[in-house]
Amino acid sequence: MQPFINVDIGGPAQPLLKVNNLVRHFHLGARKGHEVVRAVDNVSFEVIKGETLGVVGESGCGKSTTARLLMQLLNQDRGELIFDGLEVGSSRLSMKAYRRQVQMVFQDSYASLNPRMTMEESIAFGQRVHGVSQKEAKAYAHYLLAHVGLEPGRFAHRYPHALSGGQR
């Protein structure tokens, strides 16, 4: 079974997400001479259609702040986010439209899975939101489970609490 979304970039690859000089500083203390934490300082990168971005770094280096900025859970001090050629938050690309296309996978597997949904339901949820039929979404969920080494017949109907940390 093939993934539902096949990206044919044909020709030169165009960035799907372009981050230009993203800045977020936190000001600690209200008095003159207060400390400034430069959590994200002029970060720039591009993600080409079909690519997956993973961010790795030392504790406190700005990974989570960068992710929050990309999701617009925090506002940047400076810089721009361009998604599919449109500036995020502009009149041409609403936050709702942007957030339907971009997602963040949290590093805490216990908090990122809905405890009231089976693995199959959790995996199929994103497909269903985008109009994929229940049958196709279920088949894709089974494909993905098998792809990561979890036998669908054994794991599709389990709830997150019934899986080990590594399986989550």
Region roles according to the model:
Residues M1-R168:
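ABC transporter nucleotide-binding domains
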